[in-house]
From Swiss-Prot:
Part of the 50S ribosomal subunit. Belongs to the universal ribosomal protein uL4 family. This is Large ribosomal subunit protein uL4. SUPFAM superfamilies: Ribosomal protein L4. GO terms for cellular component: ribonucleoprotein complex; ribosome. One of the primary rRNA binding proteins, this protein initially binds near the 5'-end of the 23S rRNA. It is important during the early stages of 50S assembly. It makes multiple contacts with different domains of the 23S rRNA in the assembled 50S subunit and ribosome. GO terms for molecular function: rRNA binding; structural constituent of ribosome. Gene3D superfamilies: 3.40.1370.10. Residues 48-75 are annotated as: Disordered.
Length: 206
C-alpha cells in the first residue's frame, strides 16, 4: 500500500496514511480516462443548433434572370448558398450527442485519474477542513500552505462554510466526494482531499 503524508489544513504534517493500492495504485489506463472525459463533455452539449438548407429557405422558386444575354453570371435561385439569405451548405441540425459508458470503465477511469495524481505527488491528504464561519482568507491560507493554485478540493460532505469560502477563489473548485468525476480530477493541477473522503472512495471503488 502506498504511504502518503497526512497534513492538517495549516500545512503541518500530523502523520501518515496508507492508501489502498486497489484504488490509488492501479495501472493508469489513459484510454479509459479519455473515453470517460469525452462522454462527460459530450453529455453536456445541448445539441439544439439548427440552420436551414436551400431546400428549407422560403422563396427562390423562380430563376432570378434568364440564362443568357444579361452579362451576369447564371443563377438558378436566389436561395442558393452564395446568395444573402440563401440556404446553408451542410446546415447543422439538432442531434443527440450523448454517449453511454459502462460502469466498469468509469471505475477504471476514476481510479486511474487518482493514481496519476498520487504518482505525480499532486494529491494532498488533510485530516479535515473545518471553518467556524465562511472566510475566504482561511481557504487561501490553506492553498498557500500547499503551494496550490488551480486546485480541486474534495470533502466527505458538503461543508457549507468551506464551500462558501472557496467558491469565489479563481481556479478552485470544491466538491463532495459523491460528486467526484474523472474530468475534474484531471482538469485541476492539484487535488486536496480529506481523510474521510479517501476512506469513502476506497469503500466505493476498491
Amino acid at each position: 500500500m502506498a504511504k502518503v503524508d497526512l497534513f492538517n489544513q495549516n500545512g503541518e504534517k500530523v502523520g501518515d496514511l496508507q492508501l489502498a493500492d486497489s484504488v490509488f495504485g492501479v495501472e493508469v489506463n489513459t484510454y479509459a480516462m479519455h473515453q470517460v472525459v469525452k462522454a462527460l463533455l459530450a453529455n453536456k452539449r445541448q445539441g439544439t443548433q439548427s440552420a436551414k438548407t436551400r431546400a428549407e429557405v422560403s422563396g427562390g422558386g423562380i430563376k432570378p434572370w434568364r440564362q443568357k444575354g444579361t452579362g451576369r453570371a447564371r443563377q438558378g435561385s436566389i436561395r442558393a448558398p452564395q446568395w444573402i439569405h440563401g440556404g446553408i451548405v451542410f446546415a447543422p441540425k439538432p442531434r443527440d450527442y450523448r454517449m453511454s459508458i459502462p460502469k466498469s470503465m468509469k471505475k477504471v477511469a476514476i481510479k486511474s485519474a487518482l493514481t496519476s495524481k498520487v504518482n505525480e505527488n499532486l494529491m494532498v491528504v488533510v485530516d479535515e477542513i473545518k471553518l467556524e464561519t465562511p472566510k475566504t482568507k482561511e481557504v487561501v491560507k490553506m492553498l498557500n500552505a500547499f503551494n496550490a493554485k488551480k486546485t480541486l478540493i474534495i470533502t466527505n460532505n458538503a461543508e457549507e462554510n468551506v464551500y462558501k469560502s472557496a467558491r469565489n477563489i479563481e481556479g478552485v473548485q470544491i466538491i463532495p466526494v459523491n460528486n467526484i468525476n474523472v474530468y475534474d480530477v484531471l482538469k485541476y493541477d492539484k487535488v486536496i482531499i480529506t481523510k474521510d473522503a479517501v476512506s469513502k472512495i476506497e469503500e466505493v471503488y476498491a
